[in-house]
């Protein structure tokens, strides 16, 4: 047994204890975004490798963020700005002596620059998957947006757009406009434009020429073809989350300027709170006092980074514990797939093994051909040692030696650490690993290793996986496939399209059909693995009817694998496979299929699975997410199923949803989610997600995913209409003929504090986030998605609905708001749409008395509710909905200024024509005022 320093672990373990108390966002100390002394450090902007080289992009990115820094500083009342920024240049671009990356990569970037896919055009957008006040995934800009100065007319200055998107990303606020509901009727029975603040002015425009207001208003809403153009000169200073393109807009809507009646995402998701209220509640502004003085901060500094050759080292545990539970065999099978299929060509790969000491089995070798891949497979360990000790740090140290062979440094390299042993001395190499510049992905085999080895991944920005000791689990294979290059080039990545594992009785079969869709097919590999004896009888039938048998597969008896690589491009369509267990006892048979994109002209569908946080304490639930996309385009109506495997107990299968309710924030954004609370034991849990869809049910979303910058069609300038160029909508996507399937590991998470044995119910219904209210005559009709008995699963017992004329009362003192009798409302199963109708004036005498003096005056009713389960556990109070009430019957909504609807471009109209038009309109208004019968349909400017 090797001697170890006894003082190092004490210090290291204290560090580990400290790290456990920090939030997941702070655990990645080796890189990442930080706020220090009012300045953001480490903002990472990454350019996709498919973007053609253009140094003007770098120049414009610098100018955009510099402008954004000053704009942000003033908008936040001198609280935050950008101090230093890293720009990750693709490895495909010419090397201009850029600095080398350390742990930075495209898939960790805060901002990405990539070609827009399908019909999104050039809209900048932020991918938001969490709720109000919580961070998003990334900001996306297209090269065209950054290079084409003419787009500034529609979107506004790039720096202002960046701040709009930054508020989405960093502070979790939402758009204050709504393309689906551009108009609404306010509490004064006026038709208003959805905006914030309501002080922003403009005029209604009809596409069919000068027309009376009646032609633009039908049944209290605007006819298609009517639009609203804003005045280019405004007095309103807000809001950045509505229209930062207006020169006067320099701040976020606050408590005094917020338009809580507007039907936008900000009001829905944040319960009518202003964007500034949400932003000031963030940790950024809570811990940042305004900078003294009147001057601006220094401009940001920029560092240009570029990845070099990709360097990977497998660091494999061969201690005695690897003999348990077929761990070594499962490792061999998964590592063979990684080396033969997943790792990309031209990568340098080395292999290290360790028990109580480390050993280099293969120095770095670059992959050019399948022969190079087979040679690396031959270096995989074939037996475990007799040494019971596991010295993870010894293996990691040898791994660093291997990756440093390339250029003397570990910067930008990747270590894939696979271990089954608990090592109390792992803290000895935490700081070394964190400062190495290498990213460490860890796979913990069995429960004893899982709790500590993940720290190496957290500190270096790597992925961590927990692999249960079950041969029926395909988790290790899925983990290896998940570890991609991180470059963002999905056309080079291997995608897992099938993963099936079943225990098959003797002389019985595992048979199924899988799909090779039209976007994949290159470099397609079928891998069959078994548990004991010789290979099963294999029959594989392609869409044209060609049959492949066992003899067509390459058999590795030592690793118990059979692989078949389809030459060229695999035929698109349905493939059928049959595995017959010829062994005399039951055994687990597995089928894995991986493939690459078939063409650069068509983005393949991708699946990214992840959890909100990688550790939680009982009874806090875990939120599981699956980001399903075709390029950058959301895929809707797919069947998305998560499988969660605990250390002990049976797997839990859960369907993820994209309905905008429960754990899901935005409907139809391609991010499917669900609460998970079926905790069997304290410990680690492994996550895998499968996606399948039929072309008859799945569609591609038409709007831009997430929250995006508004493209303004035109403005009113000096009483003239100035239209911008039509927005670029791109091209329509090609419809998939066969549907598709994908599989992805979501890594692992840990749960602490789960009680032993039976315990009382501690899981309430989830918060209702999509409550809507609508006035129908004198009644209010409510609708929402039903929560469950436990979060978003099962069936809740009852609802508590309350209303008030005071927003403060309903939001801050819900228990004392007026109770609505909902005793006859029987809750439905989670996910079902609920409706409930009530009359506010009949709820209580208290409200009747409150309204007695101004019964004919318009007023707003605020409504919220919460659910209760059979254990009397209550959900959080829902989002707040409002509805405008009262006014005499038959009154029609009006537009709030003088009666005029403009059409076309008036820049060629002379001053005389304008004066004549004004006189005609004034004459019409004068005449209409004499006709009371038409007063109710009066149309006005906003």
From Swiss-Prot:
<keyword id="KW-1003">Cell membrane</keyword>
<feature type="glycosylation site" description="N-linked (GlcNAc...) asparagine">
    <location>
        <position position="286"/>
    </location>
</feature>
<dbReference type="GO" id="GO:0015276">
    <property type="term" value="F:ligand-gated monoatomic ion channel activity"/>
</dbReference>
<dbReference type="GO" id="GO:0046872">
    <property type="term" value="F:metal ion binding"/>
</dbReference>
<feature type="active site">
    <location>
        <position position="165"/>
    </location>
</feature>
<feature type="binding site">
    <location>
        <position position="164"/>
    </location>
    <ligand>
        <name>Zn(2+)</name>
    </ligand>
</feature>
<feature type="glycosylation site" description="N-linked (GlcNAc...) asparagine">
    <location>
        <position position="522"/>
    </location>
</feature>
<keyword id="KW-0868">Chloride</keyword>
<dbReference type="GO" id="GO:0005254">
    <property type="term" value="F:chloride channel activity"/>
</dbReference>
<feature type="site" description="Cleavage; by autolysis">
    <location>
        <begin position="708"/>
        <end position="709"/>
    </location>
</feature>
<keyword id="KW-0130">Cell adhesion</keyword>
<dbReference type="GO" id="GO:0009925">
    <property type="term" value="C:basal plasma membrane"/>
</dbReference>
<feature type="glycosylation site" description="N-linked (GlcNAc...) asparagine">
    <location>
        <position position="580"/>
    </location>
</feature>
<dbReference type="GO" id="GO:0005654">
    <property type="term" value="C:nucleoplasm"/>
</dbReference>
<keyword id="KW-0479">Metal-binding</keyword>
<keyword id="KW-0472">Membrane</keyword>
<dbReference type="GO" id="GO:0005886">
    <property type="term" value="C:plasma membrane"/>
</dbReference>
<keyword id="KW-0862">Zinc</keyword>
<keyword id="KW-0378">Hydrolase</keyword>
<feature type="binding site">
    <location>
        <position position="175"/>
    </location>
    <ligand>
        <name>Zn(2+)</name>
    </ligand>
</feature>
<feature type="region of interest" description="Metalloprotease domain">
    <location>
        <begin position="54"/>
        <end position="205"/>
    </location>
</feature>
<feature type="domain" description="VWFA">
    <location>
        <begin position="311"/>
        <end position="483"/>
    </location>
</feature>
<dbReference type="GO" id="GO:0006821">
    <property type="term" value="P:chloride transport"/>
</dbReference>
<comment type="function">
    <text>Plays a role in modulating chloride current across the plasma membrane in a calcium-dependent manner, and cell adhesion. Involved in basal cell adhesion and/or stratification of squamous epithelia. May act as a tumor suppressor in breast and colorectal cancer. Plays a key role for cell adhesion in the beginning stages of lung metastasis via the binding to ITGB4.</text>
</comment>
<dbReference type="InterPro" id="IPR036465">
    <property type="entry name" value="vWFA_dom_sf"/>
</dbReference>
<keyword id="KW-0813">Transport</keyword>
<dbReference type="GO" id="GO:0005229">
    <property type="term" value="F:intracellularly calcium-gated chloride channel activity"/>
</dbReference>
<feature type="glycosylation site" description="N-linked (GlcNAc...) asparagine">
    <location>
        <position position="74"/>
    </location>
</feature>
<feature type="glycosylation site" description="N-linked (GlcNAc...) asparagine">
    <location>
        <position position="97"/>
    </location>
</feature>
<dbReference type="InterPro" id="IPR002035">
    <property type="entry name" value="VWF_A"/>
</dbReference>
<keyword id="KW-0482">Metalloprotease</keyword>
<protein>
    <recommendedName>
        <fullName>Calcium-activated chloride channel regulator 2</fullName>
        <ecNumber>3.4.-.-</ecNumber>
    </recommendedName>
</protein>
<feature type="glycosylation site" description="N-linked (GlcNAc...) asparagine">
    <location>
        <position position="231"/>
    </location>
</feature>
<dbReference type="Pfam" id="PF13519">
    <property type="entry name" value="VWA_2"/>
</dbReference>
<feature type="signal peptide">
    <location>
        <begin position="1"/>
        <end position="32"/>
    </location>
</feature>
<dbReference type="InterPro" id="IPR004727">
    <property type="entry name" value="CLCA_chordata"/>
</dbReference>
<feature type="topological domain" description="Cytoplasmic">
    <location>
        <begin position="927"/>
        <end position="942"/>
    </location>
</feature>
<feature type="topological domain" description="Extracellular">
    <location>
        <begin position="33"/>
        <end position="905"/>
    </location>
</feature>
<feature type="glycosylation site" description="N-linked (GlcNAc...) asparagine">
    <location>
        <position position="821"/>
    </location>
</feature>
<keyword id="KW-0325">Glycoprotein</keyword>
<comment type="similarity">
    <text>Belongs to the CLCR family.</text>
</comment>
<keyword id="KW-0068">Autocatalytic cleavage</keyword>
């Amino acid at each position: 047994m090797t001697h170890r320093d006894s003082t190092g672990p004490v210090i290291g373990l204290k560090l580990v204890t400290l790290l456990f108390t920090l939030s997941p966002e702070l655990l990645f100390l080796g890189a990442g975004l930080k706020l220090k002394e009012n300045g953001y450090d480490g903002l990472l902007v990454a350019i996709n490798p498919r973007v053609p080289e253009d140094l003007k992009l770098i120049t414009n990115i610098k100018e955009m963020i510099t402008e954004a820094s000053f704009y942000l500083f003033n908008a936040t009342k001198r609280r935050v700005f950008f101090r230093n920024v890293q720009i990750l240049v693709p490895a495909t671009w010419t090397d201009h002596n850029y600095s080398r990356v350390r742990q930075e990569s495209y898939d960790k970037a805060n901002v990405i620059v990539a070609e827009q896919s399908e019909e999104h055009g050039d809209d900048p957008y932020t991918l938001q998957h969490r709720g109000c006040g919580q961070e998003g995934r990334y900001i996306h800009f297209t090269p065209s947006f950054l290079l084409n100065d003419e787009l500034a007319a529609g979107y506004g200055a790039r720096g202002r757009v960046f701040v709009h998107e930054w508020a989405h990303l960093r502070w979790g606020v939402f758009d204050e406009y709504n393309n689906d509901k551009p108009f609404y009727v306010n509490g004064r029975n006026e038709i208003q434009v959805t905006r914030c603040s309501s002080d922003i002015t403009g005029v209604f425009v009809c596409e069919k020429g000068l027309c009376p207001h009646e032609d633009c208003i039908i049944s209290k809403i605007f006819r298609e073809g009517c639009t609203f153009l804003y005045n280019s000169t405004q007095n309103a200073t807000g809001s950045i989350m509505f229209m930062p393109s207006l020169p006067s807009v320099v701040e976020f809507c606050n408590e005094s300027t917020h338009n809580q009646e507007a039907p936008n995402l900000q009001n829905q998701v944040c319960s009518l709170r202003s964007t500034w209220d949400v932003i000031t509640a963030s940790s950024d502004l809570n811990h940042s006092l305004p900078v003294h003085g009147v001057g601006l901060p220094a401009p940001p500094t920029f560092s240009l980074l570029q990845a070099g050759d990709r360097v990977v080292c497998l660091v494999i545990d061969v201690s005695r514990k690897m003999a348990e539970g077929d761990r070594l065999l499962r490792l061999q099978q998964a590592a063979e797939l990684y080396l033969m299929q997943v790792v990309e060509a031209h990568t340098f790969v080395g292999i290290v093994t360790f028990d109580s000491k480390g050993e280099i089995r293969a120095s770095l070798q670059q992959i050019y051909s399948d022969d190079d891949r087979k040679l690396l497979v031959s270096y995989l360990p074939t037996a475990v040692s007799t040494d019971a000790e596991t010295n993870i740090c010894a293996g990691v140290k040898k791994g660093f030696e291997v990756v440093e062979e390339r250029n003397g440094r570990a910067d930008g390299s990747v270590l894939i650490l696979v271990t089954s042993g608990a090592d109390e001395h792992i803290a000895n190499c935490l700081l070394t690993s964190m400062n190495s510049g290498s990213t460490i992905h860890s796979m913990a085999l069995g429960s004893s290793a899982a709790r500590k080895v993940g720290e190496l991944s957290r500190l270096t920005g790597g992925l961590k996986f927990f692999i249960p000791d079950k041969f029926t689990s395909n988790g290790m294979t899925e983990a290896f496939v998940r570890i991609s290059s991180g470059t963002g080039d999905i056309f080079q990545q291997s995608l897992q399209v099938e993963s099936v594992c079943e225990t098959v009785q003797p002389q019985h079969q595992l048979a199924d059909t899988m799909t090779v869709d039209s976007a994949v097919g290159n470099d397609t590999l079928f891998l069959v693995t078994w548990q004991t004896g010789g290979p099963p009888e294999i029959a594989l039938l392609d869409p044209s009817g060609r049959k492949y048998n066992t003899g067509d597969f390459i058999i590795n008896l030592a690793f118990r694998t059979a692989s078949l690589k389809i030459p060229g491009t695999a035929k698109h369509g349905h493939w059928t496979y049959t595995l017959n267990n010829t062994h005399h006892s039951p055994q687990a048979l597995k089928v894995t299929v991986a493939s690459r994109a078939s063409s650069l002209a068509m983005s393949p569908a991708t699946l990214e699975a992840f959890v909100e946080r990688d550790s939680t304490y009982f009874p806090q639930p875990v939120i599981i997410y699956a980001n399903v996309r075709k390029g950058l385009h959301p895929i809707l109506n797919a069947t998305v199923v998560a499988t969660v495997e605990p250390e002990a107990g049976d797997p839990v299968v859960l369907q993820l949803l994209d309905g905008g309710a429960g754990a899901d924030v935005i409907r139809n954004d391609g991010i499917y989610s669900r609460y998970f609370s079926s905790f069997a034991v304290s410990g680690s849990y492994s996550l895998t997600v499968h996606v399948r869809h039929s072309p008859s049910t799945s569609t591609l979303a038409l709007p831009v995913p997430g929250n995006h910058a508004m493209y303004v069609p035109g403005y009113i300038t000096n009483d003239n209409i100035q239209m911008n160029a039509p927005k670029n909508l791109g091209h329509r996507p090609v419809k998939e003929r066969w549907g598709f399937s994908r599989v992805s590991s979501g890594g692992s998470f840990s749960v602490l504090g789960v009680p032993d044995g039976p315990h009382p119910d501690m899981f309430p219904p989830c918060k209702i986030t999509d409550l809507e209210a609508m006035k129908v005559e004198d009644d209010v009709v409510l609708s929402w998605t039903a929560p469950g008995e436990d979060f978003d699963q099962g069936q809740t017992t009852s609802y508590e609905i309350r209303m008030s004329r005071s927003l403060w009362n309903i939001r801050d003192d819900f228990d004392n708001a007026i109770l609505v009798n909902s005793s006859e409302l029987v809750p439905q199963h989670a996910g079902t749409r609920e409706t409930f109708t009530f009359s506010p004036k009949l709820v209580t005498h208290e409200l009747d008395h409150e309204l007695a003096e101004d019964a004919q005056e318009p007023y707003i009713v605020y409504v919220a509710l919460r659910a209760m389960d059979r254990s009397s556990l209550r959900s959080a109070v829902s989002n707040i909905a409002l509805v405008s009430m009262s006014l005499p019957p038959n009154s029609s909504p009006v537009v709030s200024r003088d009666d005029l609807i403009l059409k076309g471009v008036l820049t060629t109209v002379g001053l005389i024509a304008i004066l004549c038009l004004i006189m005609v309109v004034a004459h019409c208004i004068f005449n209409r005022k004499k006709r009371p019968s038409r007063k109710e349909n009066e149309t006005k400017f906003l």
